[in-house]
From Swiss-Prot:
<protein>
    <recommendedName>
        <fullName>Uncharacterized HTH-type transcriptional regulator in aarA 3'region</fullName>
    </recommendedName>
</protein>
<dbReference type="Pfam" id="PF01380">
    <property type="entry name" value="SIS"/>
</dbReference>
<feature type="DNA-binding region" description="H-T-H motif">
    <location>
        <begin position="40"/>
        <end position="59"/>
    </location>
</feature>
<dbReference type="InterPro" id="IPR036388">
    <property type="entry name" value="WH-like_DNA-bd_sf"/>
</dbReference>
<keyword id="KW-0805">Transcription regulation</keyword>
<dbReference type="GO" id="GO:0003700">
    <property type="term" value="F:DNA-binding transcription factor activity"/>
</dbReference>
<dbReference type="GO" id="GO:0097367">
    <property type="term" value="F:carbohydrate derivative binding"/>
</dbReference>
<dbReference type="InterPro" id="IPR001347">
    <property type="entry name" value="SIS_dom"/>
</dbReference>
<dbReference type="GO" id="GO:1901135">
    <property type="term" value="P:carbohydrate derivative metabolic process"/>
</dbReference>
<dbReference type="InterPro" id="IPR000281">
    <property type="entry name" value="HTH_RpiR"/>
</dbReference>
<dbReference type="GO" id="GO:0003677">
    <property type="term" value="F:DNA binding"/>
</dbReference>
<dbReference type="Pfam" id="PF01418">
    <property type="entry name" value="HTH_6"/>
</dbReference>
<dbReference type="InterPro" id="IPR047640">
    <property type="entry name" value="RpiR-like"/>
</dbReference>
<keyword id="KW-0804">Transcription</keyword>
<dbReference type="InterPro" id="IPR035472">
    <property type="entry name" value="RpiR-like_SIS"/>
</dbReference>
<dbReference type="InterPro" id="IPR009057">
    <property type="entry name" value="Homeodomain-like_sf"/>
</dbReference>
<feature type="domain" description="SIS">
    <location>
        <begin position="125"/>
        <end position="265"/>
    </location>
</feature>
Length: 282
């Protein structure tokens, strides 16, 4: 019996059922959490019917007995909760609902972002990071947070990287890159004028360019050699529920894992040296 069939039948009994059927259906729909640990006698008492009525009810619903009914009910309950989380947050949600809905929204946004990643492109970008003399990072406003996170990850594994939150310093970088460098630009929507200007400067220098931005055909995407896309939902970002920076970090971390597989021995040595330096601080 399908999961949605059971709930549909219970809801139908509220309208056309009689006496015992209605009482059991109402309890099962309104008291989902309470039912989980109940045996036949406990359900009968809670719903105000006899134990025999419960057994008869389950058989009328198409089950061999109470145990089979309960297994299907709990499966149906799992789907019900998942569907109830699909809606957006609203001012009337209690704390438990806020936690659950937020978690579901983060999971969905992350999964959708990872689905946008092309393995061949990831391989190519990871190899470019390995081969680059320097990694030059561009990011302004809140995108600078992501750029700094990337910068810190790279220098920890002894990869030469440049970043400054100062726009004028970034402009200086973009004017002085060469063909041996690799630019990684971070922009939420791909239409930040300063970022696009610096990408144009880097392109004129013959420097390879990567852009980490929302999926689509914005100007930054057209200017870059390769793109790391992430899932962008205007409604979620405008309300501040999920920020682009979270998803951008997840996408880069995924790329970074690939990079680490290409430089494993060097990474281990670099991290060991870092730990030793920290220990020496006492």
């Amino acid at each position: 019996m399908g999961m949605s069939t059971l709930t549909s039948k219970l809801e139908s009994l509220l309208n056309r059922g009689k006496g015992t059927e209605q009482r059991l259906a109402r309890f099962l729909l309104d008291s989902r959490d309470n039912f989980v640990a109940m045996n036949v006698a406990e359900l009968a008492q809670a719903a105000g019917v006899s134990s025999a009525s419960v057994i008869r009810f389950t058989r009328q619903m198409g089950y061999r007995g109470y145990s089979d009914f309960k297994v299907d009910y709990l499966s149906d309950e799992k789907q019900y909760k998942a569907e109830s989380l699909s809606g957006s947050l609203n001012p009337y949600d209690d704390t438990e609902q806020i936690i659950a809905k937020s978690g579901q929204m983060f999971i969905t946004a992350i999964e959708k972002s990872l689905e946008l990643l092309d393995p061949n492109t990831m391989d190519e970008i990871a190899q470019k990071i390995v081969e680059a003399k320097r990694i030059v990072l561009f990011g302004v406003g809140t995108s600078a947070i992501v750029a700094y996170d990337i910068f810190y990850k790279l220098i920890r594994v002894n990869k030469y990287a440049l970043f400054s939150p100062d726009l004028h310093v970034q402009l200086s970088y973009s004017s002085n890159v060469d063909a041996d460098d690799l630019v990684i630009a971070i922009t939420a929507k791909g239409n930040t004028p300063d970022i696009n200007h610096m990408l144009k400067l880097a392109n004129k220098k013959g420097c390879s360019t990567i852009v980490l931005t929302r999926f689509g055909q914005d100007e930054a995407v057209r200017l870059a050699d390769l793109v790391l896309p992430y899932f962008y939902d205007e409604q979620l970002f405008q309300t501040g529920v999920i920020t682009p920076q979270v998803l951008q970090m997840v996408v880069f971390d995924t790329l970074f894992f690939k990079y680490l597989t290409l430089t494993n021995e060097d990474v281990v040595l670099a991290l060991q040296k870092e730990r030793e330096a920290i220990i020496q601080l006492g």
